[in-house]
Regions:
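Substrate-binding cleft/loops of secretory-pathway carbohydrate-active enzymes
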Residues: 1-24, 102-112
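Residue-level detector of intrinsically disordered, flexible termini
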Residues: 11-13, 31, 210
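Generic hydrophobic, helix-prone segments enriched in Leu/Val/Ile
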Residues: 1, 26-30, 163-165
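Loop/helix patches that line or flank the sugar-binding groove of alpha-linked glycan CAZymes
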Residues: 17, 34-35, 44-216
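Core domains of carbohydrate- and sulfate-ester-processing enzymes
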Residues: 6, 17-42
């Protein structure tokens, strides 16, 4: 539950995978959470290298529906993002999902639909303007269209999640466990190396109780 072990990379192929298992089930966070269980990690040398995403230029999750850009309520999107940035794998965001661009639009119909009406429409205009960055996921000012883009609640949610993930090594590289975790979606993650011992307790959209945790001082990252 709390221990980290170094994966046997000598047995790795060097090719990591897109996490289709989670993608297909991201209609809701709970669906993805239930299917991405520790018992399935035996199929991967190191599941922290899986590329995890909700929607793409081809498909949304099953039932979302698949042929349209993700159209579920904002609360669903926010939960999906929270799980993506804290659970196994590397989060991958499809361009413009941070503002729900073309939400619910058909993703692609080839020559039978103008590109501007599809989910693959041009997004560059939303990035016009100036932004002054000071550090990873932090900026002091943003003007023009990009300023409006950055002000979207999802863009800010992603920015905060990225900053939290960067600050906590366990959320990037740690193995996870559900042992001693009581709640709808909660887990422990730990990562150790010669200079690092990072440990995190995570719950998504709900209360949780953790048992058998490591001694020490716990700090709220959110």
């Amino acid at each position: 539950g709390n221990d980290y072990h170094l994966p046997d990379y000598s047995r790795a192929s060097g090719l990591h995978v897109i996490d289709f298992t989670m993608h297909h089930n991201f209609e809701t966070m709970s669906n993805a959470w239930n299917v991405a269980c520790p018992e399935n990690d035996k199929y991967y040398n190191d599941a922290t290298w899986n590329v995890v995403y909700v929607d793409s230029h081809d498909y949304a999750p099953n039932g979302a529906p698949e042929d349209k850009r993700y159209s579920k309520p904002q609360a669903n999107w926010a939960e999906n993002l929270s799980l993506m940035f804290t659970y196994r794998g590397i989060p991958c965001l499809y361009y413009s999902s941070e503002i729900e661009f073309k939400k619910g639009c058909t993703i692609d119909k080839g020559p039978n639909m103008p590109l501007r009406e599809s989910g693959r429409a041009y997004f560059g205009g939303y990035l016009k303007g100036d932004i002054q960055g000071v550090d990873f996921a932090h900026y002091t000012s943003a003007s023009g269209n990009v300023g409006q883009t950055w002000s979207h609640p999802f863009a800010q949610h992603i920015r905060r999640l990225a900053a939290i993930r960067m600050a906590v090594p366990a959320l990037r590289k740690g193995q996870y466990s559900r042992t001693g975790c009581s709640g709808s979606c909660c887990f422990k993650r730990r990562y150790t190396d010669a200079t690092t011992d990072s440990y995190a307790l995570v719950t998504i959209s709900g209360n949780a109780t953790f048992a058998g945790i490591l001694n020490g001082q716990y700090v709220d990252c959110v």
